[in-house]
C-alpha cells in the first residue's frame, strides 16, 4: 500500500488533466514576452484579482523578495509578523537582497491587526531610526497553521498603511485556500494591495511557479528585479500552462482538502502527543 504523504501541500503532483495541458501548451521565449502560455496565465491572474498586470516568477520566495525590493530602499524597515515567511523562510533575503530591516510584531496565529501598525511606524523625521516604508502580511499564515484574515481586517490594515504612507504587500502563497475557506471575492484583493504573490505549486498542484500582481508601473519594474534575481525564463509556458490549469480546474477542490484536513484533525485530537495549531 502506498503511503499518504501529508508533510506539506508542496508534495502535490500534476493531475492527468494538468499533464495534458502541459504537453499541449504553446510556448515561446518569455524573456521576449513571446510565450503565449505565460502571457495567458499572467492576464488571467491579473483579471482574477482585479489588478492591472501580473508577472510569472519561478518561486514564491523570489516573488516576495522582488516585491520587497520594489517597495523599499536600503536602510529602510518593513513591518511583518514575527512568524512571517518573508522573515523566517526566505534565507535572510530581506537584508541580503534589499538591505532592509524588519520590525517584527506578535499576534495570534501569525495575524496582524490594524491597531498594531501605527505604534510600529518609526517617526519619519527621526533619522536615528530606519524609515518605515512597507507592511507585509501573509494569508493564509504558514507558521500559524493556515489561519485566514477576514477581508475587513485586511482593509483596516490597508487604511493604516495609507495614513502613514506605507506600501502594502500580501504574501498570498496560500491565498487560494483563504478565498475558498472564507468565500471571498478575489477582485477585492487587487485594489487593496500594492502587490500580491500567489503560489501555483501547493494546493493547486502545479510543479512550480508564483505570480506577482499589481499596478502596471510596479510590474514593469518587477521585470527588471526578476532579471537581477535570476528569474528570467525562456520556454516556460509548459509550467505556466500547469498553473493556469490548476486555477481553472482545481481551485474549487481546495474545499475538499479543507474538509479532509478537518476530519483528520478530529481523529488526531484524542492523541496526547498531537497539538492543535488552532
Residue ranges, per PLM feature:
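Conserved PLP-enzyme active-site core in the AAT-like
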Residues: 1-278
Amino acid at each position: 500500500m502506498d503511503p499518504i504523504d501529508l508533510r506539506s501541500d508542496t508534495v502535490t503532483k500534476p493531475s492527468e488533466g494538468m499533464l495534458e495541458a502541459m504537453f499541449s501548451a504553446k510556448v515561446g521565449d518569455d524573456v521576449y514576452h513571446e510565450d503565449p502560455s505565460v502571457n495567458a496565465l499572467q492576464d488571467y491572474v491579473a483579471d482574477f484579482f482585479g489588478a492591472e498586470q501580473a508577472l510569472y516568477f519561478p518561486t514564491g520566495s523570489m516573488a516576495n523578495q522582488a516585491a520587497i525590493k520594489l517597495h523599499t530602499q536600503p536602510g529602510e524597515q518593513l513591518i511583518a509578523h514575527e512568524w512571517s515567511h518573508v522573515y523566517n523562510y526566505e534565507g535572510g533575503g530581506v537584508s541580503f537582497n534589499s538591505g532592509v530591516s524588519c520590525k517584527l510584531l506578535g499576534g495570534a496565529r501569525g495575524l496582524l491587526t490594524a491597531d498594531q501598525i501605527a505604534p510600529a511606524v518609526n517617526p519619519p523625521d527621526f533619522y536615528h531610526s530606519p524609515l518605515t516604508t512597507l507592511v507585509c502580511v501573509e494569508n493564509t499564515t504558514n507558521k500559524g497553521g493556515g489561519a485566514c484574515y477576514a477581508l475587513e481586517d485586511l482593509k483596516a490594515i490597508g487604511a493604516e498603511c495609507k495614513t502613514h504612507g506605507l506600501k502594502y504587500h500580501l504574501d498570498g502563497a496560500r491565498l487560494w485556500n483563504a478565498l475558498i475557506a472564507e468565500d471571498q471575492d478575489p477582485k477585492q484583493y487587487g485594489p487593496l494591495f500594492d502587490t500580491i504573490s500567489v503560489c501555483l505549486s501547493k494546493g493547486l498542484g502545479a510543479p512550480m511557479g508564483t505570480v506577482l500582481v499589481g499596478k502596471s508601473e510596479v510590474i514593469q519594474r518587477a521585470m527588471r528585479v526578476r532579471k537581477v534575481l535570476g528569474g528570467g525564463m525562456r520556454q516556460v509556458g509548459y509550467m505556466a500552462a500547469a498553473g493556469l490549469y490548476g486555477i481553472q480546474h482545481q481551485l474549487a477542490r481546495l474545499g475538499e482538502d479543507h474538509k479532509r484536513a478537518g476530519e483528520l484533525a478530529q481523529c488526531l485530537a484524542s492523541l496526547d502527543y498531537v497539538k492543535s495549531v488552532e
